[in-house]
């Protein structure tokens, strides 16, 4: 089946991206790569081997699409503020005490910030608090752009400053409006398609995510 997929992709000039996140055997990733199918790497999920350190940008896969976050995560601004923990607690789907989740999450975020600083895309003095959050978001996208991955992607919600999750795993529509959340700016004002490029954050993130220098 993978061979047929690869053949059809070659015939039509199509790039195929596999979502190989989570519990996927390395042998599967190797087989997909053998057929030229790109994998997926998410900055927030990437550890350096079995350590608690973040993976260096140079150690990312070539045959992959790299993103800062995913559709199952809140926008980056919200993630920095612990919005993913707060929302799950409010919805009653948090399986551990919020304090435990928050402590672990902050430790991991700090590991990522340390790597960003090591690679020179984030000032070590910057902290992920309201005054510096946008600098952190920009640094994350510069980091993604610095990887050797074949493709990178920037989430639209990040480019307009939205803070609401588009999808909350483990819930149904009666608990959370999955995939029905309108695109808004940081002030929760609706953003229309024709207005996206004029958003203040759009140009900043586009420059940060551009390869070869912002």
Question: What do these predicted ranges mean?
Answer:
Residues 1-214:
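Catalytic cores of glycan-processing enzymes that make or break glycosidic bonds
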């Amino acid at each position: 089946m993978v061979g047929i997929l690869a053949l059809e992709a070659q015939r039509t000039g199509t790039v195929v991206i596999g979502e190989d996140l989570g519990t996927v055997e390395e042998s599967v990733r190797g087989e997909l790569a053998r057929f030229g199918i790109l994998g997926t790497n998410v900055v927030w999920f990437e550890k350096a081997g079995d350590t608690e350190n973040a993976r260096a940008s140079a150690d990312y896969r070539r045959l992959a699409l790299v993103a800062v976050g995913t559709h199952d995560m809140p926008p980056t601004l919200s993630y920095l503020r612990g919005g993913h923990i707060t929302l799950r607690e409010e919805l009653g789907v948090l399986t551990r005490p919020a304090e435990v989740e928050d402590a672990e999450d902050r430790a991991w975020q700090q590991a990522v910030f340390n790597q960003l600083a090591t690679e020179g895309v984030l000032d070590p003095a910057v902290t992920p608090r309201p005054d510096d959050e946008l600098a952190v978001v920009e640094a994350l996208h510069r980091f993604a752009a610095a990887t050797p991955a074949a493709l990178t992607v920037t989430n639209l919600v990040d480019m307009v400053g939205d803070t609401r999750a588009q999808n909350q795993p483990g819930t149904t529509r009666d608990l959370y409006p999955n995939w029905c959340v309108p695109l808004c700016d940081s002030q929760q004002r609706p953003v229309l398609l024709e207005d996206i490029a004029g958003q203040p954050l759009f140009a900043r993130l586009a420059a940060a995510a551009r390869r070869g220098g912002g």
